[in-house]
A protein has these predicted regions:
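Bacterial N-terminal signal peptides that target proteins for export
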Residues: 1-7
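Homeobox/homeodomain signature
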Residues: 7-8, 34
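Basic/polar N-terminal segments that are highly enriched at the extreme N-terminus
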Residues: 1, 20-23
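Hydrophobic h-region of N-terminal signal peptides that target proteins for export
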Residues: 11-20
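Auxiliary tRNA-acceptor-end handling modules of aminoacyl-tRNA synthetases
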Residues: 22-192
Length: 192
């Protein structure tokens, strides 16, 4: 019985892996007519109501900060909210980007250190939140769909105050995309 479960589990994993590999589009299929590209450190692609973030290849393995704030509403002005925080961008395969929240009791910042290999083996990290790669840009940057994380999700930032009503997702919208020297910011209007 256990052997049958293992075989079924392996078949499911192989099927999921093959589906994930087929889901990555070519850049020409991805970049449709009417799509705009906003250049920056992390280029952003906008097509109608869909937002895609490009993770350049040189940022795989690096850390970024994901945070948010309420600018106004509910008697809150410029109030920080719970954000994803500092995450490491990893790519376990060509079809996935993960935001890993590293947990270290100690760190080695020099990647050429003689202790780096033993340190990485003794500090295995959880995979983190994974995002399917939609397409790769001509510069080999991985494009991930981030629309729902900005508009309705609470993965990247959340606010759990009792006086904030429930979200009305169909009225929420992206107001502005602002690339700057170190990253990109989004102004999102969420209706509650």
């Amino acid at each position: 019985m256990k052997r049958r479960r293992y075989v079924i589990g392996i078949l499911l994993c192989v099927t999921a892996l093959l589906q994930a590999q087929d889901s990555v589009k070519s850049f020409d299929e991805f970049f449709v007519a009417g799509m705009d590209k906003i250049d920056g450190v992390f280029p952003v692609y906008v097509a109608e109501k869909e937002i895609y973030l490009e993770i350049p290849e040189k940022y795989i393995g690096r850390e970024i900060e994901v945070s948010g704030q309420i600018d106004r509403g509910f008697d809150l002005l410029n109030r920080p909210v719970d954000g994803l925080g500092v995450v490491r961008i990893i790519s376990p395969d060509k079809a996935t980007i993960c935001f890993q929240k590293p947990f270290y009791t100690e760190r080695i910042l020099d990647e050429k250190s003689t202790y780096q290999q033993s340190f990485s083996l003794s500090n295995m990290q959880p995979a983190g939140k994974s995002y399917p790669v939609v397409a790769y840009s001509k510069e080999q940057g991985a494009n991930i769909r981030i629309t729902e994380y900005l508009m309705t999700g609470d993965d990247w930032f959340s606010y759990n105050d009792n006086f904030i009503r429930s979200l009305v997702p169909e009225l929420s919208e992206i107001m502005k995309i602002h690339p700057f020297k170190e990253g990109v910011s989004f102004t999102v209007r969420r209706y509650h």
